[in-house]
Amino acid sequence: MAKSYLWMLLLLFSLALAACTKDGSTIYQVNPDEEKPSTAPLVTVIYGPNSLGDRSYCDKIYRGVEASASKHGIRTLHLMPESMEQGLTYLEMIFQQMESAQDSVSRLFIATSPVYDEFIRKNNRRLESNSFADLLYLETSTPLEGKGSTLYIDYYGAMYMAGCLSPHDDFDLLLLVLANPYTQSVVEAGEGFVDGYNSVTPKIEKPLNIKYLSNEPGGGFQLADTTALRIFEETQRYVYDKVCVVPVCGGAMNAFFRIMPDNSYYISIDDYIPIKRCENRINVIKNIDTVLNNYIEQWIDDTMPKHQTLGLDDGGTDLYFTKGTGWLEDEDVDVDGVRQIAIRKEGERYEK
């Protein structure tokens, strides 16, 4: 019964691909008078469950892919499952469609989340039967055996800078919220921030509290507003404490924004979103949109690398200072010096 259900979904999915495609940001129906279906390259992206609309990492991926689609005239399909089970069903359908395709249409499948790691590594060789199909797997530092490319953007250096510079801001304590203690990008971001914070000399006495949203691998990437509010309130030692939130988790750029009291302190993660009622002088940026734009160009030119690890030195990450760096220079902080230390420490981790 389950097998019949899967084939029914595959049939419906194939019909959807044939009936409604996406070229850049324009959705159109196939003209029945056309003699041949489109042969334009197709990029399909799958996101983690309920992750689009996060105003950070996933939304930047969407923008990067669509910018490339508009530039190169490729078709795109974005899939956001409601659950892990639905995500695995989507993956199986995509792999079946790509490995069995009889045409010469170039197809790139982008898996954006490490929650699909087991499936990707068990099934990537299936695509070797189609020389026009390729795979790009994000958020892993371990290359695939067999077909497919991998890309990892290391947050250690940028978060080291943020941890080193943030204590100079005008708040009472730091709250570092991490999704879980297992996801590599989250763990390394946390390590970078803590190492940077501990490197400040002379020591600035501002407590650093660390909170994990989940103890499960892959957990902590969905966050209700009520949970965000509870975490924030539990951190305050006193009602008048000024807490600076550093969220490397689900809800980083939406749930926490909605519950933060006026004049709160915040370090934006992945993207910069101006908030008039909050102080977010430091913003840690992951340039996944521009990186993906470049990757798709390399895929079109058949030069996509097998694996790359990018970071602060490569432009994969950066810091954006909302109000410039004058407030740091007033305290004789050498921002460029901190950057060079962060780049060196990040490079030592990956032997760059």
Model-derived features with residue positions:
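C-terminal motif of bacterial Sec signal peptides marking the signal peptidase cleavage site
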Residues: A16-A19
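Bacterial lipoprotein signal-peptidase II cleavage site
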Residues: T21-I27
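Extracytoplasmic "Venus flytrap"
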Residues: P37, V43-G64, S68, L79-L88, ...
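Periplasmic-binding protein-like
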Residues: V45, A101-P114, L136-L138, Y238-G250, ...
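An alpha-beta-alpha
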Residues: V65, Y160-E205, K306-D330
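Flexible loop/hinge segments that line or gate small-molecule binding clefts
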Residues: E128-D154, Y272-R277
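Hydrophobic alpha-helical segments within soluble ligand-binding/sensing domains
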Residues: T150-L174, V284-T303
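Hinge/cleft segment of the Venus flytrap/periplasmic-binding protein
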Residues: N294-K352
